[in-house]
Amino acid sequence: MAIQNTRIKTAGLLLLLCVLAVPLLAPSIVPNEIRAQSANDEIPRLANGRPDIQGIWDFRTITPFQRPEDLADIEVLTDAEAVAFEDAENERRDRDNFTDTSTTGDYNQFWYDRGTEILDDGRTSLIVDPANGRIPTLTDAARNRNQLRTKAAQEAAGVEVRPLSERCIMGFNSGPPMIPSAYNNNVQLVQTEEFVLIHNEMVHNIRPVKMNASSHLEVPRKWEGDSIGRWEADTLIIETRNFARETAFGNSSANMYLEEKFWMIDADTLGYEF
């Protein structure tokens, strides 16, 4: 899946990120739908002419979300540097090579599915804007929210205040927005005239995107927020608001506004940006 243009607007935190395309592999399962495709169009389409983005898509990559500090001045690796980076990163992440036996409650390497390669273009981060490939400095309000959330998790009086990913309510890569992570980097998309359904493998969250709605529901606030979609030419644009306080991305507030875009690059590659 391609993560290409990230735009996150929040109260107290404003990020303007462009996240580079992470190619999704060809869908392994495609729901049965009538497909209409012209001889000069490589993009699969439904009978109504809309791009057919349905299928199960893979968005794994070991390209870091943020550029590592030791690569601060390097935007793109050479082919040789990319191979060296992949070898070193795969070696570093291989749990079977760990010698520290004091850790409990962790997995061995068998359970991880991060992928083994960086993006084809050799970029050193998914973030492309800011130019340094890193998330901008948090505002005071965002830092305060982070401290409060960390304290709440450390001093939890009951399971109700433990992190959602720990309780398997929301997956840590399912978002929204979706970001490659340790495993379960797969998402299924299903289209109808009224809805687009986004089904993440991680914890099996299903997010309905309303295609014919004109306004967002303010209550109840939901884990995945309230999503409304529209087509602009061949690009699906999804706007999401009214997140639950516990699920706001990147230490933002529950007033976070998220815009995502999906588009077909070719028959086997889906573009995704947020």
What are these regions (language model features)?
Residues 2-274:
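PEST-like low-complexity, intrinsically disordered acidic/proline/serine-rich tracts
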